[in-house]
Amino acid sequence: MKEQIEKLYEKYRRGRLKAVIICVIAYFAMMGVVNMFLGSPFPHKTQILFMETMANGWINTHGYLLILCGIIGIIVGMGSILYQIIHDFEKFDKILLEECDTKKYLELMEYAVSYGTEIKPKDFQKSVFTLAQQRYVLALMAEHCFPKAMAYLQNHWQGKKTTNLYRNTALSAQLVSSFENRNGEEFAGLYQKGEKLFRKNGIFLGKKLFLEGKYADAVELLQNIQKKTNYQEVQRQYMLAMCYEALKETEQASICMEYVAKYGNTTPCRYAAEQWKRENASVVLSETMIE
């Protein structure tokens, strides 16, 4: 996998040239579309009834379309390369999202950042490096290395810290860290600050309700979240287990912990689930016998 990281950086070493080529192709393609509706772009002879006359061409009559075609070409050229970079990262993200292997993912993203620093990225390699940094921080969070994640964001992040990518990553790190510390007041403030960002992830709202002591509401919310990735499902099941335990529903908590222990792979919550099962085995057994 490390070789694939190196190939990814090499692939976009001349990314700007690829973007220019795509931009030019898109530019002329857009001009072709305009030609279909407005005719030739250049001055030309045309015949109206029995008279021959000169037509200005749409470059003279609708010159703004030339600029518009150029803008669209630039957007398509740049956007296509950035889309390819994001798409290329998806095969690495599957290690976390589908395999739930947080240790392997962290090792890989750590190498991606280290290698990117070593080669001094140029051109679109800078975009690859920025996404590698973001995923490295997310990998640290997934491994519950919260102080290290915050330290990297504050002291070692290379690039602008005013971008949405940096701000959202930093906010996510602060939010997860505050939950780990069970700081309900801080968590609520951070959640409100980034509500639009976290609205699509019901697990964050479930954590907010948990810290507020609204365990039944959290259970109802978490039960209605549809599975998107294996990693999210493991996180959802673990949160449900925590809520059930708080509600003294040990048997339900045990079912959720069993799922986490089985599918959690190398995630920290898997080890926590296994420990919980060992510590509560007698309680679960007694409740089962009573029923």
What are these regions (language model features)?
Residues 82-91, 125-135, 161-172, 194-204, ...:
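Generic helix N-cap/helix-start motif at coil->alpha-helix transitions
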Residues 6-8, 105-114, 146-158, 182-195, ...:
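Alpha-helical repeat scaffolds
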Residues 6-15, 39, 73-103:
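Transmembrane-cytosolic junction motif
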Residues 51-73:
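Hydrophobic alpha-helical transmembrane segments
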